[in-house]
């Protein structure tokens, strides 16, 4: 799990973890002292929290081992552009959106690219990719 850079191809993969692929040994992927079960959401997901460069991030697997996504707070790259710290106008340009509007949770849900952008002080604080 330790990496300096998370390379995301929307709807397909992040680094070598493919969305919707089943990893029967997914707990081995997290086999490190700083990856701990964060929560179990009913019978749907196992969520693991791991620390990377002093920042907590989350990874999700469905109970059958299917990779369901991640929430990352640092070093998330899309086409060699680090998304963390970008403002909403920059996100519109990067992804070709005409308009994006923050919801009441200071987030933007972009179903077409399977991402939720979480903002704080008008800058991306984290991104959930699924």
Task: Please tell me what each predicted stretch does.
Residues 1-130:
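Short helix/turn-capping signatures at newly exposed starts of structured segments
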């Amino acid at each position: 799990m330790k990496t300096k850079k998370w390379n995301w191809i929307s709807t397909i993969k992040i680094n070598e973890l493919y969305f919707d692929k089943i990893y029967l040994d997914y707990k081995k992927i997290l086999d490190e002292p700083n990856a701990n079960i964060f929560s179990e959401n009913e019978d749907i997901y196992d969520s693991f929290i791991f620390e990377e460069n002093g920042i907590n991030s989350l990874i999700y697997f469905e109970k059958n081992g299917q990779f369901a996504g991640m929430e990352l707070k640092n070093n998330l790259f899309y086409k060699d552009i680090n998304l963390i710290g970008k403002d909403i106008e920059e996100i519109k340009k990067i992804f070709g959106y005409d308009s994006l509007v923050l919801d009441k949770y200071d987030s933007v849900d972009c179903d077409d690219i399977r991402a939720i952008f979480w903002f704080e002080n008008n800058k991306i604080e984290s991104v959930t990719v699924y």
